[in-house]
């Protein structure tokens, strides 16, 4: 159990039998009435965000989330197989557990897998990945009426907006959190 006075960003807690990460918190002491803590919580399983108030000093169960470094191996039907880097034990992941990150998965990529009570509750991808451009239209000189970018399909099937000078076969650095082009690799 942890007191609401000890809340900090990134802490994982159990609320209504679900695991949440605190993404924002604020101690509020109104002129009249008892103090409380206003929080913004992100559901680790679904990614949904809720706002919740806790009384000052209220005890909340702390969720003991274990993070294991694993390597993504291959896709097997609807499942994605990852191997623990220490024990070599293989774990099968679903598309729902990986979320939007499935667009950036590449074989032999290292992932952070989050476990709660022995069950996978989330997957942390690296902040950036290097992917090759599989298809993009050639940039036409002087064609900046559309804002200076064009769509490019990457080797994993993800589509991102890239500058006109990017050509097929080039390797790009992509931010997995936003899905945006960062730079050439």
Curated annotation (Swiss-Prot):
Domain of life, source organism: Bacteria
GO BP field: peptide biosynthetic process
SMART domains, per database record: EFP, Elong-fact-P_C
Subcellular location(s) per record: Cytoplasm
Family label: Belongs to the elongation factor P family.
Protein's recorded name: Elongation factor P
Protein role: Involved in peptide bond synthesis. Stimulates efficient translation and peptide-bond synthesis on native or reconstituted 70S ribosomes in vitro. Probably functions indirectly by altering the affinity of the ribosome for aminoacyl-tRNA, thus increasing their reactivity as acceptors for peptidyl transferase.
Encoding gene per record: efp
Pathway annotation from the record: Protein biosynthesis; polypeptide chain elongation
InterPro entries for this protein: Elong-fact-P_C, NA-bd_OB-fold, Rib_uL2_dom2, Transl_elong_fac_P/YeiP, Transl_elong_KOW-like, Transl_elong_P/YeiP_cen, Transl_elong_P/YeiP_CS, Transl_elongation_fac_P
One GO MF term: translation elongation factor activity
Organism from which the protein derives: Desulfitobacterium hafniense (strain DSM 10664 / DCB-2)
Keywords: Cytoplasm, Elongation factor, Protein biosynthesis
Pfam families attached to this UniProt entry: EFP, EFP_N, Elong-fact-P_C
Matches recorded under CDD domains: S1_EF-P_repeat_1, S1_EF-P_repeat_2
PROSITE patterns in the cross-refs: EFP
Keyword Cytoplasm: yes
